[in-house]
Amino acid sequence: QAIIKLAKAYGLDDPKIAPHVPMDPNLKLKKGEGNEIIPEAECSYAAMVGSLLYLSLTCRPDIAAAVGVLSRFMSCPTAEHVDAARRVISYTYTTRELGIVHRRDGVNNPVLAFCNHEDSLELSRQQEPDLMTSYADADLAGDISTRRSTTSVCVLLNGGLVAWISRLQPTVALSTTEAETIATTDCVKLLMHLRLLLRELGREQQQPTIVYEDNQAAVKLTAMPEQSKRAKHYQMKVHFLKGMVKNGVYRYIWISTHDQ
């Protein structure tokens, strides 16, 4: 109902062209300057983004990345920003029947999407119900204004998302390995909270939670016994991750970028 109400408020409940993705991946938004900036009274940009932010935090993780980008321009929106926000609203309306599905068999394994039915059934039997898995990723210097990277995290339980993160990293990462390490740190901190929550609910995780990561250097970094010279400036995060691996909180599994 919230999606329908939002779309009707901005005349987007019957779009002529339904977008397949929330935001054009080739779109690079930047802060408006001077006469480019549109007053809030004329465009209601903050109101649109605020409504989308609510949806992205509660039930629509698929728009989290797009809304995160839009929220960076609340004080200086241009016509381009308004069009991008309207596109996200249009997307949420045309995909309003989509939802998060949790399965009783507890399958989180991405391999199941790339095998035949018999293999899928066999792998399903190997999965334990109520076992979390997660994905961590980052785009290096994705923000063109600050050159900061964006952390992306997804946590699945019984085949459906239960938690997600899409936010700008607080510092500028100097390499993909550093950006991915920062993202994994955020992921593991979230996993620590969720593991404690599941324990209180009587669903304690008996195994380390899998973190799928597509950067081989970041995966190898936590397995190195010695200190990496290239990672001296973020060694605290590396040692934190090493400690969490040792304590059985999580374990890395490399996955291809295509599957990530």
Question: Which residues are covered by each model-predicted region?
Answer:
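Long, low-complexity, charge-biased intrinsically disordered regions
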Residues: Q1-Q260
